[in-house]
UniProtKB/Swiss-Prot annotation:
Subcellular location: Mitochondrion outer membrane; Cytoplasm; Cytoplasm, Cytoskeleton, Cilium basal body
Lineage: Eukaryota, Metazoa, Chordata, Craniata, Vertebrata
Keywords: Cell projection, Cytoplasm, Cytoskeleton, Kinase, Membrane, Mitochondrion, Mitochondrion outer membrane, Transferase
Species the sequence originates in: Xenopus laevis
Any Gene Ontology CC annotation: mitochondrial outer membrane
Sequence positions that bind ADP: K29, R105, T111, R122, V129, N132
Domain free text: The N-terminal hydrophobic region (1-17) is critical for mitochondrial outer membrane targeting and phosphatidic acid binding.
Gene of this entry: nme3.S
Single GO MF descriptor: nucleoside diphosphate kinase activity
Domain of life: Eukaryota
Any one Gene Ontology BP term: CTP biosynthetic process
Protein name: Nucleoside diphosphate kinase 3-A
Function, in words: Catalyzes the phosphorylation of ribonucleosides and deoxyribonucleoside diphosphates, other than ATP, into the corresponding triphosphates with ATP as the major phosphate donor. The ATP gamma phosphate is transferred to the nucleoside diphosphate beta phosphate via a ping-pong mechanism, using a phosphorylated active-site intermediate. Through the catalyzed exchange of gamma-phosphate between di- and triphosphonucleosides participates in regulation of intracellular nucleotide homeostasis. Required for ciliary function during renal development. Independently of its kinase activity, facilitates mitochondrial tethering prior to membrane fusion through its direct membrane-binding and hexamerization. Implicated in repair of both single- and double-stranded breaks in DNA, independently of its kinase activity.
Cited NCBIfam families: PRK00668.1 (NF001908)
Pfam family name, one: NDK
Residues of the active site: H135 (pros-phosphohistidine intermediate)
Length: 169
């Protein structure tokens, strides 16, 4: 119940999602799921010290995907992207931690895998921009919008990470 209240509070006061409480939305795309990269991707974020507060495997509807990628609706690849994202299971996740939005983007790598450094998810596992394994929110604002789009407030789990004192000063 406390978690639900905190989540609703965070929707009303976005500044509540800062510091070690910052949250981001990540989605392992159908290619990442089919290639069995889910465990490896989760492992990387856990080893970094971030907390997984929500996860679900789902077949995303066209309506959800069109809302999710609304900012890209004028791009020539928009319909192809929506069709591709609906072609198989997606692993939707919410991660929490200090500067998680920015750090997750660094860990993921560039949108075009050819520009991604080794050690990043896309640098290690991707070749083609159209099959780049994972989506990550690009700002706190988009993270809040995407989390609200993919998850109900009661699906976000608040928990105290016993390793937190070993991660944050």
């Amino acid at each position: 119940m406390i978690c639900l209240v905190l989540t609703i509070f965070a929707h009303i006061f976005p500044s509540a999602w800062t510091g070690i409480n910052e949250r981001t939305f990540l989605a392992i795309k159908p290619d990442g799921y089919q290639r069995r990269l889910v465990g490896e991707i989760i492992r990387r974020f856990e080893k970094k010290g971030f907390c997984l507060v929500a996860l679900k495997i789902m077949q995303a509807s066209e309506k959800l995907l069109r809302q999710h990628y609304i900012a890209l609706q004028d791009k020539p690849f928009y319909d192809r992207l929506v069709k591709y994202m609906g072609s198989g299971p997606v692993v939707a996740m919410v991660w929490q931690g200090l500067d998680v939005v920015k750090t997750a983007r660094v860990m993921i790598g560039e949108t075009n895998p050819a520009h991604s450094l080794p050690g990043t998810i896309r640098g290690d596992f991707c070749i083609d921009v159209g099959r780049n394994v994972i989506h990550g929110s690009d700002s706190r604002e988009s993270a809040q919008r995407e989390i609200a789009l993919w998850f109900q407030p009661d699906e976000l789990v608040c928990w105290q990470d016993s390793a937190e004192r070993w991660i944050y000063e």
